[in-house]
Every structure is written in C-alpha cells, then in structure tokens.
C-alpha cells in the first residue's frame, strides 16, 4: 500500500487523481527558475538546448522520480528523514538546516518575483508580497486537497497553455533559431576557444560551471527532492510514479 492509502489522514495523506497530482507536481517544480534561467542561459547559444534536453532526460527526471519513489517506499517521509535513515542523525540535522535555509531563499524568490510582475497591474509591491504570504500560510495550514488541490491545477494549466502558445508562435512567425553547429563547427583546443567561454558574454561566465548554475531548475535541481515527497503522499498506486515524477520534469524541460 502507498502512504496515501496506508496512512490516510485527510490532511497530508490523501488519495488524489493522477492528473491532479501531475499538475501540482509540475507547478511545484516549474516556477520562476526554469523560465528566467532558460532566458538567461540563451546567452550561451545552442549548448543551452543540449543541457536542457539531456539534463532533463538523464539527470533531472531521474532525480525527481527517485526522490518521489524513495519517499513513497518509506511512508511519505521528507528528504531530511530519508537522509537520516541511511546516513545517521548528524547528517540528517545538517540536511535539515541546509534544506530550511535553501527553502527560505527559494521562498523569497517565489514571493518577490511575482510581486514585481503583479505590481505593474494593480497595487503596490508590498501589498502583493503580503497577499502572497497570506495565501502561502492558508494553503499550508489547510488540507492539501482544499486549496492546493483545487488552485494549483489551474495555474499549471495556465503555464502549459503559455508554453503551447509559444510553440504555435514559433511555427507562425518562424523566428531564426541558431543551429547547433553554427558556433561549434570549427572549434578546437588550439585555434578557437569560444566554446570554452572566452568571448563576449562568456568571457566572465564560462560554460563550465556557469551554464549549469544558470540553467539548473530547468535541467536538474535538488530543490525538487523537497517537493516530490509532498505528492508521494497522495499517489494511490506506485505505477503512477513514473508518469507523475519523471513526466513532470520532462514537461518542465519542454
């Protein structure tokens, strides 16, 4: 039995439809990071495409799937508890502090960035920051199917609609997209160092490691390991794990 069935409590452990879990998982991991990161990563040219595609398939989606299934197999526990089980309490406490600090920083970004965008539509920036914080608190305190289970799928649908609209726009406008070999056709160690990150923008931001930091959430992100267990508590059958956890990350990459 999955935790949603064996430990059902009507709050965190609740069986929900697979499509709804997928949409919530997708929105949990596809925030401002993959959007702004990919835009900034475009400075690196075609190599950014490769990192997003191969990073998602072989790293990010595998990471999300494993973190979700590990949590499911261990009663729906969070990341620090999983670390503590296999690496001891000391490592668990270190991971707990580390996770809290990173989640605080991620939370600040996820509050401040929407507030800046919404400020131009209505109200002040501080007004939106307070409103978003109030929403977060209410959504956290209520059972997961009351607010998150009802609103998140709508937000996720909006994000997917935006992505498909952009895809249609590409086919309608047919903008120029640089080919992979346009920057790499004559690269070699001795004569051309552009691919190592020594020209223009990349002079101070070499491909390694800056590209992998700039486009992190869009290809692989350890932050997702804190989100997958939340949905692992709502899955009815283990066979739903791959389309939900692996599939949500692939969708984010797309």
Model-predicted regions and their roles:
Residues 1-14, 38-41, 46, 62-91, ...:
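Flexible loop linkers connecting adjacent transmembrane helices
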Residues 24-29, 58-75, 79-142, 216-220:
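Helix-loop-helix module between adjacent transmembrane segments
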Residues 107-111, 115-130, 139-140, 159-196:
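Hydrophobic alpha-helical segments and their helix-loop junctions in multi-pass secondary transporters
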